[in-house]
Swiss-Prot record:
Origin species: Vibrio campbellii (strain ATCC BAA-1116)
SUPFAM superfamilies: YcgL-like
Domain YcgL as annotated: residue spans: 1-84
Protein name (database record): YcgL domain-containing protein VIBHAR_01387
Pfam families linked to this entry: YcgL (PF05166)
Domain of life per record: Bacteria
C-alpha cells in the first residue's frame, strides 16, 4: 500500500497521510483549514515497513476506513513532575 505524507504549515510535528498523492477529497474541510497548506514530505510503501512515531497497521487501517491518517506530536513532557517523581522514589528507597 502506497501513501503520501504531508507536513502541516500551521502545526509543528503534525503530518497527514493520504492514499493518493494530492487527493485530499476524503479529508474533512475543517481539518484541512486547521492543518494549513499541506507541504509534501514523501510517498512511501507501507507494506513491510515500520514508522518512527506511529504504528503502521493503524495508519493502514485509517487510510482504508477513513481515507486519511493524522499524526499529531506527543504531548510535551513535564520535566518538573518527572523530577519530583524520581525524588519521591529515591526517598522511599
Amino acid at each position: 500500500m502506497l501513501c503520501s505524507i504531508y507536513k502541516s504549515s500551521r502545526k509543528e510535528g503534525t503530518y497527514l497521510y493520504i492514499p493518493k498523492k494530492d487527493d485530499f477529497s476524503q479529508v474533512p474541510d475543517t481539518l484541512m483549514q486547521m492543518f494549513g497548506k499541506p507541504m509534501p514530505v514523501m510517498t512511501i510503501k507501507l507494506d513491510g515497513r515500520t514508522l518512527a512515531q506511529v504504528d503502521v497497521e493503524k495508519v493502514k487501517a485509517s487510510l482504508i476506513n477513513d481515507g486519511f491518517f493524522l499524526q499529531v506530536p506527543p504531548p510535551p513532557e513535564n520535566l518538573l513532575e518527572k523530577y519530583k517523581e524520581q525524588k519521591a522514589q529515591q526517598k522511599g528507597e
